[in-house]
Curated annotation (Swiss-Prot):
Belongs to the ArgR family. The gene is argR. Pathway: Amino-acid biosynthesis; L-arginine biosynthesis [regulation]. One of its GO terms (biological process) is regulation of arginine biosynthetic process. Regulates arginine biosynthesis genes. It comes from the Bacteria. The keyword Transport does not apply. It comes from Escherichia fergusonii (strain ATCC 35469 / DSM 13698 / CCUG 18766 / IAM 14443 / JCM 21226 / LMG 7866 / NBRC 102419 / NCTC 12128 / CDC 0568-73). This is Arginine repressor. InterPro entries: Arg_repress (IPR001669), Arg_repress_C (IPR020899), Arg_repress_C_sf (IPR036251), Arg_repress_DNA-bd (IPR020900), WH-like_DNA-bd_sf (IPR036388), WH_DNA-bd_sf (IPR036390). One of its GO terms (cellular component) is cytoplasm. It is found in: Cytoplasm. One of its GO terms (molecular function) is DNA-binding transcription factor activity. The lineage of its organism: Bacteria, Pseudomonadati, Pseudomonadota, Gammaproteobacteria, Enterobacterales.
Amino acid sequence: MRSSAKQEELVRAFKALLKEEKFSSQGEIVVALQEQGFDNINQSKVSRMLTKFGAVRTRNAKMEMVYCLPAELGVPTTSSPLKNLVLDIDYNDAVVVIHTSPGAAQLIARLLDSLGKAEGILGTIAGDDTIFTTPASGFSVKELYEAILELFEQEL
Protein backbone atom coordinates (compact mmCIF):
# COMPACT_ATOMS: atom_id res chain seq x y z
CA MET A 1 0.00 0.00 0.00
CA ARG A 2 1.29 3.47 -0.83
CA SER A 3 2.45 5.43 2.18
CA SER A 4 -0.01 8.28 1.51
CA ALA A 5 -2.88 5.78 1.31
CA LYS A 6 -1.68 4.18 4.54
CA GLN A 7 -1.46 7.63 6.14
CA GLU A 8 -5.03 8.45 5.05
CA GLU A 9 -6.19 5.14 6.49
CA LEU A 10 -4.41 5.95 9.77
CA VAL A 11 -6.07 9.38 9.94
CA ARG A 12 -9.52 7.85 9.31
CA ALA A 13 -8.95 5.22 12.02
CA PHE A 14 -7.61 7.85 14.44
CA LYS A 15 -10.63 10.13 13.95
CA ALA A 16 -13.03 7.20 14.27
CA LEU A 17 -11.43 6.19 17.58
CA LEU A 18 -11.68 9.71 18.99
CA LYS A 19 -15.35 9.89 18.01
CA GLU A 20 -15.96 6.96 20.36
CA GLU A 21 -15.04 9.29 23.27
CA LYS A 22 -13.62 6.50 25.43
CA PHE A 23 -9.85 7.05 25.36
CA SER A 24 -8.47 8.84 28.40
CA SER A 25 -4.76 8.49 27.56
CA GLN A 26 -2.52 8.61 24.53
CA GLY A 27 -1.32 5.10 25.40
CA GLU A 28 -4.86 3.76 25.04
CA ILE A 29 -5.08 5.32 21.57
CA VAL A 30 -1.72 3.76 20.61
CA VAL A 31 -2.91 0.29 21.67
CA ALA A 32 -6.22 0.69 19.80
CA LEU A 33 -4.43 1.76 16.60
CA GLN A 34 -1.91 -1.10 16.92
CA GLU A 35 -4.83 -3.53 17.26
CA GLN A 36 -6.12 -2.17 13.94
CA GLY A 37 -2.81 -3.02 12.26
CA PHE A 38 -0.90 0.25 12.55
CA ASP A 39 2.28 -1.30 13.93
CA ASN A 40 4.49 1.79 13.49
CA ILE A 41 2.32 3.99 15.71
CA ASN A 42 3.75 5.26 19.00
CA GLN A 43 2.86 7.79 21.68
CA SER A 44 4.76 10.66 20.06
CA LYS A 45 2.94 10.14 16.73
CA VAL A 46 -0.40 10.06 18.56
CA SER A 47 0.56 13.25 20.42
CA ARG A 48 1.39 15.00 17.13
CA MET A 49 -1.90 13.83 15.59
CA LEU A 50 -3.89 15.05 18.60
CA THR A 51 -2.27 18.47 18.21
CA LYS A 52 -2.66 18.53 14.42
CA PHE A 53 -6.39 17.83 14.57
CA GLY A 54 -7.06 20.09 17.56
CA ALA A 55 -8.19 17.28 19.85
CA VAL A 56 -9.08 18.25 23.40
CA ARG A 57 -9.76 16.38 26.61
CA THR A 58 -13.30 16.76 27.82
CA ARG A 59 -15.86 14.86 29.84
CA ASN A 60 -17.92 12.24 28.04
CA ALA A 61 -21.46 11.15 28.96
CA LYS A 62 -20.01 8.99 31.76
CA MET A 63 -18.16 12.05 33.14
CA GLU A 64 -14.77 10.52 32.23
CA MET A 65 -12.01 12.76 30.86
CA VAL A 66 -11.46 11.58 27.28
CA TYR A 67 -9.90 12.83 24.05
CA CYS A 68 -12.30 14.08 21.40
CA LEU A 69 -12.17 16.07 18.19
CA PRO A 70 -13.76 19.50 17.86
CA ALA A 71 -16.81 19.74 15.61
CA GLU A 72 -14.76 21.65 13.05
CA LEU A 73 -11.18 20.88 12.16
CA GLY A 74 -8.58 23.54 11.50
CA VAL A 75 -8.50 27.01 13.00
CA PRO A 76 -12.01 27.99 14.03
CA THR A 77 -13.55 31.30 13.00
CA THR A 78 -15.93 33.66 14.76
CA SER A 79 -18.59 32.87 12.15
CA SER A 80 -18.57 29.20 13.19
CA PRO A 81 -20.87 27.83 15.89
CA LEU A 82 -17.98 28.13 18.35
CA LYS A 83 -19.19 31.58 19.33
CA ASN A 84 -22.24 29.86 20.82
CA LEU A 85 -19.91 28.18 23.31
CA VAL A 86 -18.97 31.50 24.93
CA LEU A 87 -21.16 31.98 28.01
CA ASP A 88 -19.74 35.13 29.62
CA ILE A 89 -16.97 37.68 29.12
CA ASP A 90 -15.72 39.95 31.91
CA TYR A 91 -12.54 41.83 32.85
CA ASN A 92 -10.62 43.46 35.68
CA ASP A 93 -7.50 45.64 35.79
CA ALA A 94 -5.24 42.85 34.52
CA VAL A 95 -7.04 40.32 32.31
CA VAL A 96 -10.16 39.52 30.32
CA VAL A 97 -11.86 36.35 31.57
CA ILE A 98 -14.01 34.30 29.21
CA HIS A 99 -16.29 31.55 30.51
CA THR A 100 -17.26 28.83 28.03
CA SER A 101 -19.24 25.63 27.94
CA PRO A 102 -17.31 22.76 29.59
CA GLY A 103 -14.48 21.55 27.36
CA ALA A 104 -14.67 24.51 24.95
CA ALA A 105 -12.07 26.85 26.42
CA GLN A 106 -9.12 25.46 24.44
CA LEU A 107 -10.99 25.83 21.14
CA ILE A 108 -11.98 29.42 21.86
CA ALA A 109 -8.44 30.23 23.07
CA ARG A 110 -7.06 28.79 19.83
CA LEU A 111 -9.30 31.14 17.87
CA LEU A 112 -8.19 34.13 19.94
CA ASP A 113 -4.51 33.19 19.63
CA SER A 114 -4.92 32.95 15.84
CA LEU A 115 -6.11 36.58 15.79
CA GLY A 116 -3.10 37.69 17.80
CA LYS A 117 -1.65 41.11 18.48
CA ALA A 118 -3.49 42.86 15.65
CA GLU A 119 -6.69 42.41 17.67
CA GLY A 120 -4.92 43.36 20.90
CA ILE A 121 -4.32 39.83 22.19
CA LEU A 122 -0.89 39.16 23.69
CA GLY A 123 -1.82 35.64 24.71
CA THR A 124 -4.33 33.30 26.31
CA ILE A 125 -4.35 30.64 29.00
CA ALA A 126 -7.19 28.11 28.76
CA GLY A 127 -8.49 25.57 31.20
CA ASP A 128 -11.56 23.41 30.69
CA ASP A 129 -14.17 26.18 30.71
CA THR A 130 -12.27 29.40 31.49
CA ILE A 131 -9.84 31.52 29.46
CA PHE A 132 -7.57 34.31 30.73
CA THR A 133 -6.56 36.75 27.99
CA THR A 134 -4.06 39.57 28.40
CA PRO A 135 -3.76 42.62 26.14
CA ALA A 136 -0.83 43.30 23.83
CA SER A 137 1.30 46.44 24.26
CA GLY A 138 -0.65 49.52 23.26
CA PHE A 139 -4.02 48.04 24.22
CA SER A 140 -5.87 48.46 27.49
CA VAL A 141 -7.74 45.61 29.16
CA LYS A 142 -11.01 47.44 28.47
CA GLU A 143 -10.15 47.78 24.75
CA LEU A 144 -9.36 44.06 24.58
CA TYR A 145 -12.61 43.26 26.40
CA GLU A 146 -14.60 45.35 23.90
CA ALA A 147 -12.80 43.75 20.93
CA ILE A 148 -13.58 40.25 22.23
CA LEU A 149 -17.23 41.21 22.86
CA GLU A 150 -17.43 42.44 19.28
CA LEU A 151 -15.88 39.22 17.96
CA PHE A 152 -18.54 37.17 19.67
CA GLU A 153 -21.32 39.72 19.03
CA GLN A 154 -22.39 39.96 22.65
CA GLU A 155 -23.95 42.92 24.42
CA LEU A 156 -21.87 45.21 26.65
